[in-house]
Amino acid sequence: MSSASVTAFEKEHLWMYLQALGFEPGPATIACGKIVSHTHLGVNMFDKLNRDAFHIISYFLFQVLDQSLTKEVFKFCWPPFDQKSDTEFRKHCCEWIKRISGECGSSFPQVVGSLFLSPGGPKFIHLMYHFARFVAMKYIKSNSKNSSHHFVETFNIKPQDLHKCIARCHFARSRFLQILQRQDCVTQKYQENAQLSVKQVRNLRSECIGLENQIKKMEPYDDHSNMEEKIQKVRSLWASVNETLMFLEKEREVVSSVLSLVNQYALDGTNVAINIPRLLLDKIEKQMFQLHIGNVYEAGKLNLLTVIQLLNEVLKVMKYERCQADQARLTVDLHYLEKETKFQKERLSDLKHMRYRIKDDLTTIRHSVVEKQGEWHKKWKEFLGLSPFSLIKGWTPSVDLLPPMSPLSFDPASEEVYAKSILCQYPASLPDAHKQHNQENGCRGDSDTLGALHDLANSPASFLSQSVSSSDRNSVTVLEKDTKMGTPKEKNEAISKKIPEFEVENSPLSDVAKNTESSAFGGSLPAKKSDPFQKEQDHLVEEVARAVLSDSPQLSEGKEIKLEELIDSLGSNPFLTRNQIPRTPENLITEIRSSWRKAIEMEENRTKEPIQMDAEHREVLPESLPVLHNQREFSMADFLLETTVSDFGQSHLTEEKVISDCECVPQKHVLTSHIDEPPTQNQSDLLNKKVICKQDLECLAFTKLSETSRMETFSPAVGNRIDVMGGSEEEFMKILDHLEVSCNKPSTNKTMLWNSFQISSGISSKSFKDNDFGILHETLPEEVGHLSFNSSSSSEANFKLEPNSPMHGGTLLEDVVGGRQTTPESDFNLQALRSRYEALKKSLSKKREESYLSNSQTPERHKPELSPTPQNVQTDDTLNFLDTCDLHTEHIKPSLRTSIGERKRSLSPLIKFSPVEQRLRTTIACSLGELPNLKEEDILNKSLDAKEPPSDLTR
């Protein structure tokens, strides 16, 4: 290979190495302090002597090799401007290249100082070529990442095979060309983007210049001459606007008020009321010294700053609560919701179906109600002759049927609604308890002085735990409780009504009664308004009572009035419209006489039977029915005895009438005082009343036996009563338990009499006796409002009695009381009665302990009766009265199973009367072995001899 070709190869590769190392001729020339136009750089730069190129190329290669060392070595000679710096520069270059030649060895050419004096020619090109090649390998070795030692060594090894060298050269050239092509591609794209960017910048600048020109054109000219005119014009326009607003101010206020625009944006807080929750208030109070919050209202105005602070605290609390709630977020259970939705839909469909069924059933029920109501009205019309509601309507508006109720509401009623209600139109009158108590004490004081006759006639033995020393105190308690039934005026009216006409005329009893009334009650009660209807009614009732109680000839002297006519006149009173049914049937007299005569015959037959104490009759309840039959018989006998004894003396008669009338005569104001009685009744009084009533019922046999021993000639029914009672003492104990249970059971098969509530005030509701009433109790009520609507299909049981009822064992009132005209046979013997009395006394003393146990061991179902609650006291005193009336009907005989015809043929309840009630209410208890006073018996016998002829006594 010729030297010329080698030199050309080295020159070309030298320039390529320089370009590969990043040599740039322009900046390198400026950094050397040379002029670019005077410096010659390129492939042929060292063909001739070129010191500037030598300085620039050599300094660049040294700087690429080690920049810090280059600055330190050429610190004082770079750039070379003079000869000295040039010489020093050449010296340092020669030394550094010699060290490189020593490192490379034989592969690097020999370094001679003369080469640097004239930098040019083939030798210098050969040296610079190897120097550039060494720097390139160092650069590749230090800066290339994936360069290997083998790749670097290939440049240092001298080629042994020319073909291998040419192949390696071609391979390296191809790779180098690829790299250059990539760089060229990137450069071209960069230049294109640069050209586009330059064009865009130019366009934007041109647009900016155009917009600036437009702004300059739009800016107004600064014409100072017209400025003042414009200001004056604006001021005049503003003044005209203000004048228009002032002129339309009122119209604007009206429009604003209509559109609710007044004070729409006012923030003064005058009409704002802030309610701070308790949670926020507690938190602020705890942090009062940290928050420094002022008052919400200052000088009557709202403090907006405090409100804003409170709102901030509220936001903090809400944020805290939200953070607490977000920790456990709610999970939506779609399966559960779908299941619940399906269940609710099914339930809704079932409810709709049920509603349709109810609508269908409602029509049937309404038709049934209409039919039953028609049957009920028809039934009432058959027995009463008219509809029961006609008795109420038009009589007292307060008891009229109320209109249908309005839908239930929990809102309080207005005053207008309350003013229109029945409760406001007819208010309840509450009596004064103290005045009533004083009146009762006054009445009790008059009756205490007349107790001798009742001590003889009413002295039952006590089967309960009562000692002889406490008998007087207990009897006084009975009188105090049982005489709370009416006003003194009513008692005196009862006295005047019950005394027969011949006794009033022939004895000074009426004067005594009048004096007692005028002295005790003359000034205590207000004058009552005279009612002609009431006076006439009282007169007719008095006439009927006299006709029943006695057959005195004085009634027929100049007065040929039949009992039927008197009773019919009650229904055909000229003062009375026929809104009320006649209370007494037309065949009253025939029923009374037929039933009482049969009862007398049964009494005579039963008196001949001996006393029997059968164990089976004492244990089985149905076997004890004759006891209750004789109970009613005995009540009729007592009634006869009482009316007969009334003839014995003035003092005795006065006492008898006062006490009996306090209990039995119908009173006008008893009902009101009974209903208005306060419910806070003393429970101990009720307990004593019930215990004493039980004593009276159990001791009835002994009491009537003692009476019979003195007055056996008065009535044949007394002896029979003693016989029966002597053999059924234990049966009375069992019946007592059944009666207690039945008194507490509400009977739906009862209909209250017109005067039931009036009589209930004078008769103990806990007394299990024969509560039948006589003709004296029959009256037309003043207050219809206390009628009972608890009637059912069997409600006529109280109006009619069966032929087998206990009244068949009673005694005919007319035949016994009017014994002066008829003389039935008597088989009684005083000695036989006394022997029976002794036997009965022994039998009762044996059973005394059993009676203690039976009365003390009260069943659990009877215990609530001994301690009634205050709420039930009033109801028991009123309603148990009817229950005791129907005890015989419900528990002794199958009255509800009898036919309607049998009930019509039986005795009317209007003539049922039980003086046993009167006697037991005012009884003064005595011990079991105490006998009646013989002196009192003699007094009775003497008075009897004075009043009655011997023929009457033998009857």
Curated annotation (Swiss-Prot):
Modified residues (Phosphoserine): 406, 507, 524, 530, 550, 552, 715, 728, 742, 805, 908, 914, 943
Gene Ontology CC terms, in alphabetical order: centrosome; cytosol; HAUS complex; mitotic spindle microtubule
Location of the region described as Disordered in the Swiss-Prot/TrEMBL record: 474-495, 789-814, 848-876
Keyword Cell division in annotation: yes
InterPro entries hit by this protein: HAUS_6, HAUS_6_N
GO biological process: cell division; centrosome cycle; microtubule cytoskeleton organization; regulation of microtubule nucleation; spindle assembly
UniProt KW keywords: Cell cycle, Cell division, Coiled coil, Cytoplasm, Cytoskeleton, Microtubule, Mitosis, Phosphoprotein
Regions that span the bilayer: none
In-chain residues carrying the UniProt-annotated modification Phosphothreonine: 584, 823
GO molecular function: microtubule binding
Family of the protein in this entry: Belongs to the HAUS6 family.
Protein name from the UniProt record: HAUS augmin-like complex subunit 6
Source organism of the structure: Homo sapiens
Lineage: Eukaryota, Metazoa, Chordata, Craniata, Vertebrata
Primary gene name: HAUS6
